[in-house]
Amino acid sequence: MNLRGFIKQAFIFCFFSFLIFLSSFNRLESAEIEWIEVAKTTNGIQFIDRNSIKYNNRSILSVLTKYSEINPDDQTIVSTNSYLMAIDCENRLFSKLPVNSKLDQVKNWDEPINDKLIKKTIINSCSY
């Protein structure tokens, strides 16, 4: 192969590599977290990331959630925890999982008995 052919192939390779590189930024941008407040009490605020909601082929979804504990005296945030919540929309059940988990890792489903934050999280998440 002559020098001209080599330069042409190198240019084509660089061009396509650049296109692949740029397309990865588009994916990162679309995966941006968008926290939406879904419930609040005097002791805490529950958020969901609307962009993280994923349904499986049944009526079960996963959503990234964030809970911020609030000091009731001065309304400052004391601590924040993020986790993945699996939600059975049909039966209004939930399961908390580590952030990088998958829906098939759900072992037990819980009812949101007397938990306003979880109930509202289920209702809001299932409305998407």
Tell where the protein language model's regions lie, with residue ranges:
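Short intrinsically disordered, low-complexity coil segments enriched in acidic
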Residues: M1, F21, N108-W109
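N-terminal secretory signal peptides that target proteins for export/translocation
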Residues: M1-K8
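N-terminal secretory-pathway/extracellular module detecting exported/lumenal segments
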Residues: F25-Y128
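Bacterial N-terminal signal peptides
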Residues: A10-S23
